[in-house]
């Protein structure tokens, strides 16, 4: 393994500057039409995200557009394609924490809530009350990172 020379305080480390010139230009194929930066910003062709793989469905009853030089045999009528609603999976968010992770999160949240209500003079909540489903630990002073092992 090569030995790296340590730079002293008089010689600061040089980092590679990443800019517009360090990103490869789009090559015209699907893989290189969109670039996503480290901050999540995207640039390039993002039209495929809004189309879901094709143009809008043809109007019902409208004749199909056929090039004048090609003759296609008549096709059998097909059932109409269901158009996805705007609230399809793109706008919904589902997170499954699982039973043990959910219990740990609820226990920490309830412990914090009970600590804040215990400091109020007129609070009638019981201090150190955990969520009824909490089985993770009896010490409610643990932070969430400690409970889940981070």
UniProtKB/Swiss-Prot annotation:
Residues 23-37 form the CRIB domain. Residues 114-127 have a biased composition (Basic and acidic residues). The keyword Glycoprotein does not apply. PROSITE patterns: CRIB. Residues 1-20, 34-89, 114-133 are annotated as: Disordered. It is a peripheral membrane protein. One of its GO terms (molecular function) is small GTPase binding. Pfam families: BORG_CEP, PBD. Transmembrane segments: none annotated. Residues 55-66, 74-87 have a biased composition (Pro residues). InterPro entries: Cdc42_effect-like (IPR029273), Cdc42_Effector_BORG/CEP (IPR051296), CRIB_dom (IPR000095). Keywords: Cell shape, Cytoplasm, Cytoskeleton, Membrane, Methylation. It is found in: Endomembrane system; Cytoplasm, Cytoskeleton. One of its GO terms (cellular component) is endomembrane system. It comes from the Eukaryota. The keyword Iron-sulfur does not apply. GO terms for biological process: JNK cascade; positive regulation of actin filament polymerization; positive regulation of pseudopodium assembly; regulation of cell shape; Rho protein signal transduction. The modification Omega-N-methylarginine is found at residue 38. Highly expressed in the skeletal muscle. PANTHER family: CDC42 EFFECTOR PROTEIN 5, CDC42 EFFECTOR PROTEIN BORG. The CRIB domain mediates interaction with CDC42. Interacts with CDC42 in a GTP-dependent manner, and with SEPT7. This is Cdc42 effector protein 5. It comes from Mus musculus. The gene is Cdc42ep5.
């Amino acid at each position: 393994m090569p030995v790296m020379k340590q730079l002293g305080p008089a010689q600061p480390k040089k980092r590679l500057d990443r800019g517009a010139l360090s990103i490869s230009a789009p090559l015209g194929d699907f893989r290189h039409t969109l670039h996503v930066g480290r901050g999540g910003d995207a640039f390039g062709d993002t039209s495929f995200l809004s189309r879901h793989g094709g143009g809008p469905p043809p109007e019902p009853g409208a004749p199909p557009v056929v090039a004048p030089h090609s003759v296609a045999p008549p096709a059998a009528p097909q059932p109409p394609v269901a158009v996805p609603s705007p609230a399809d999976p793109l706008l919904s968010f589902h997170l499954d924490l699982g039973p043990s992770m959910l219990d740990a999160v609820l226990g920490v949240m309830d412990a914090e809530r009970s600590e804040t209500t215990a400091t109020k003079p007129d609070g009638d909540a019981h201090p150190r009350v955990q969520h009824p489903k909490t089985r993770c630990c009896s010490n409610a002073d643990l932070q969430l990172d400690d409970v889940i092992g981070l």
